[in-house]
């Protein structure tokens, strides 16, 4: 009987000694699972952020595609606007024979201008302003005693911006300081 009691105690003895090891194993397993959970949550947040970035990039790409399509179309329409403006400049406003045609051209030009403005296409007419190489294209340099050197004297063709970005530069005449004339023979004597 003493042996049976000892045998019943013996099986419990190893369990008691294994309890601290089992607790360590469970603690290690809990820590491992917590690390895996944290890694999974981090990965989930990264995937959500990546998805938002992909969505934002796709929206920007669509917006850019619309802008570039509009930019090309607006650029093609500028030749029509230029032609209407030149036609109005060349026609005599006092000529009664062409008055109805001139009024029609003015209305058509106004409609074009209104439509361009609606799509953020703005004209650049820099006459009298300082030359800006980012928005102007110098066609001719001309001496001027009255204008500040480097300013726009005349505009050959208006430039245009679309949504604040250059669509077409203005073609301009830029002033330069008058050159000093060499003294004449009479002045040397």
From Swiss-Prot:
InterPro entries for the chain: GrpE, GrpE_coiled_coil, GrpE_head
Keywords on record: Chaperone, Cytoplasm, Stress response
Biased composition (Polar residues): 1-10
UniProt-listed SUPFAM superfamilies: Coiled-coil domain of nucleotide exchange factor GrpE, Head domain of nucleotide exchange factor GrpE
Molecular function in Gene Ontology: adenyl-nucleotide exchange factor activity; protein homodimerization activity; protein-folding chaperone binding; unfolded protein binding
Main localization category: cytoplasm
Compartments it resides in: Cytoplasm
Entry's Gene Ontology cellular component terms: cytosol
Entries under Gene3D superfamilies matching the protein: 3.90.20.20, Head domain of nucleotide exchange factor GrpE
Region (Disordered): 1-21
Chaperone in keyword set: yes
GO biological process: protein folding
Subunit structure, interactors included: Homodimer.
Family, as annotated: Belongs to the GrpE family.
Function: Participates actively in the response to hyperosmotic and heat shock by preventing the aggregation of stress-denatured proteins, in association with DnaK and GrpE. It is the nucleotide exchange factor for DnaK and may function as a thermosensor. Unfolded proteins bind initially to DnaJ; upon interaction with the DnaJ-bound protein, DnaK hydrolyzes its bound ATP, resulting in the formation of a stable complex. GrpE releases ADP from DnaK; ATP binding to DnaK triggers the release of the substrate protein, thus completing the reaction cycle.
Name of the featured protein: Protein GrpE
Organism in which the protein naturally occurs: Pseudomonas paraeruginosa (strain DSM 24068 / PA7) (Pseudomonas aeruginosa (strain PA7))
Lineage, uppermost ranks: Bacteria, Pseudomonadati, Pseudomonadota, Gammaproteobacteria, Pseudomonadales
